[in-house]
Design a protein with these regions (language model features):
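C-terminal and inter-domain tail/linker signature
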Residues: 1-327
């Protein structure tokens, strides 16, 4: 990348630290983001570096001592040039400032994850999809996601990303699945096809699971208790795998996969979002997975398994869509 960074993952980790923790806004932000960059989140879409800078400053006000610790960068070369990264971050911060997401300052400590899917060309990020675990944030501040969304709807500041808001950016690729990306994307597709039996067949019996709302869990039952209710809440929604990266040969790392996916349809079933309302809902999700050799009790010898799984979606954005429909 440059003399300052060893490679593309190092660049992604480094500019994140420079922008957020070193307060590298202004000129540094313009060096790292294209003037017309598009950033999509479950809460909406932002266009251009000035919007990125404004959103960054607003979060800095809410959580001024935030540390962003990069857990992994799963990446690939992009078709036609450039590179694409799926960057998983765990943040720790103190809520000492007020803001739209967090409300009046509470002094509470928060820990949460985000995954940013970024396309970079010519040393600048020009296309991005970002999912932050807002459900974990508001819960740690003493508010349930449904209550937060209800207040946002009542105040007239409820926003959510829907497909009709999207616009094409400079990146039109679908990733580089490889063996491990294809495997994980296939598993998610089968789960969303109600084939829940793939969990005990393909997840390790002692799998480590990190789910929305800051949930940490282990084992097949925990995976089933996350995926089944999510699908049940939107039983007829169209599931799409939007982007896949697989990596199997990075030194000192297990095989990994990053999958960005979406559910588009109506809230027609029971699940984590209460009684069915018929509300139109779009869910943007990003998952990371690590694979390993340990097979639990239901695998044929020699097979692989999902040992760790990270899933991110924004519960507050889903509730906004449901409650906005209810009026």
């Amino acid at each position: 990348m440059t003399d300052r960074y060893a490679d593309f993952p190092d660049w992604i980790l480094g500019i994140t630290r420079e922008i957020w923790e070193d307060r590298g806004l202004g000129a540094r932000m313009r060096e790292c983001y294209g003037a017309d960059a598009i950033v999509r989140t479950p809460a909406g879409i932002g266009r251009g570096e000035p919007a990125m800078t404004a959103a960054t400053m607003a979060t800095m006000v809410e959580l001024p001592d935030r540390q962003l610790m990069g857990e992994d960068v799963i990446w690939c070369e992009a078709e036609g040039g450039g590179r694409f990264s799926s960057h998983r971050i765990v943040s720790v911060a103190t809520h000492t400032g007020g803001g739209v997401l967090t409300g009046p300052p509470t002094g509470r400590r928060v820990t949460y994850r985000a995954i940013a899917d970024c396309y970079a060309e010519g040393g600048k990020i020009t296309d991005e999809w970002l999912v932050r675990d807002n459900g974990a944030i508001v819960r740690q501040l003493g508010v349930e996601p449904r209550d937060w969304a209800a207040a946002a709807v009542a105040a007239g500041r409820a926003e959510a990303f829907t497909l009709d808001l999207d616009e094409p950016g400079p990146y039109g690729g679908r990733g580089d699945p490889g063996e491990w990306g294809e495997r994980y994307a296939d598993l998610l597709t089968r789960i969303m096809g109600a084939e829940l039996s793939v969990i005990p067949a393909n997840w390790d019996r002692a799998c480590h699971l990190l789910y929305p709302g800051g949930v940490t869990a282990h084992g097949w039952d925990s995976a089933d208790r996350f995926w089944l209710p999510l699908r049940s809440a939107f039983p007829s929604a169209a599931f799409a795998v939007d982007h896949v990266i697989g990596r199997g040969d990075d030194p000192m790392m297990p095989p990994r996969a990053a999958v960005r996916w979406s559910l588009s349809g109506r809230h027609e079933g029971w699940g984590p979002f209460g009684p069915p309302t018929g509300a139109p809902v779009h869910v943007m999700g990003i998952c990371h997975a690590e694979f390993g050799p340990f097979r639990g009790g239901r695998h044929a010898p020699g097979e692989w398994s999902v040992r760790r799984e990270w899933v991110l979606l924004d519960e507050t954005a889903i509730w906004v869509q449901i409650l906005r429909h209810a009026g």
